């Protein structure tokens, strides 16, 4: 009995370590020192060298002026025209917003509203979800 419990405990501990090791992120896994040295030396050689060029005051002013000229047209946008949408007239027998609208009832009066049912279609009401419709 004790041997089987010891075997089960050992198996459980091994499974815990196995699951913990398999869920480690790739960068957290232990690496070889040789792999680290090879990767770091290759990465440095892959990138081209960078040359630093000093700008004089005149070129700075020109580039600043060019940037301001580019910004000005982008800021001036044509204002959005609010086009009044003509809504269709509501149907003659209709249900007002927030009133009960069970399926045999007529449609909602507001064209942007729809009949929303809850609790297995026991409580239905006309609702407007998009006020800018």
UniProtKB/Swiss-Prot annotation:
Glycosylation site positions: 39
GO biological process, one term: melanin biosynthetic process
Keywords per UniProt: Disulfide bond, Glycoprotein, Knottin, Secreted, Signal
SMART domains recorded: Agouti
Keyword Signal: yes
Major subcellular site: secreted
Pfam family, one: Agouti
Signal sequence residues: 1-22
Residue ranges, annotated region (Disordered): 56-95
Keyword flag ATP-binding: no
Compartments reported by the entry: Secreted
UniProt xrefs under SUPFAM superfamilies: Agouti-related protein
Residue span(s) of domain Agouti: 94-133
Molecular functions per Gene Ontology: melanocortin receptor binding; neuropeptide hormone activity
Compositionally skewed regions (Basic residues) per UniProt: 70-79
Gene Ontology CC, one term: extracellular space
Disulfide bonds: 94-109, 101-115, 108-126, 112-133, 117-124
Cited PANTHER family: AGOUTI RELATED (PTHR16551), AGOUTI-SIGNALING PROTEIN (PTHR16551:SF1)
Role of this protein: Involved in the regulation of melanogenesis. The binding of ASP to MC1R precludes alpha-MSH initiated signaling and thus blocks production of cAMP, leading to a down-regulation of eumelanogenesis (brown/black pigment) and thus increasing synthesis of pheomelanin (yellow/red pigment).
Domain notes for this protein: The presence of a 'disulfide through disulfide knot' structurally defines this protein as a knottin.
Name by which UniProt lists this protein: Agouti-signaling protein
Gene expressing this chain: ASIP
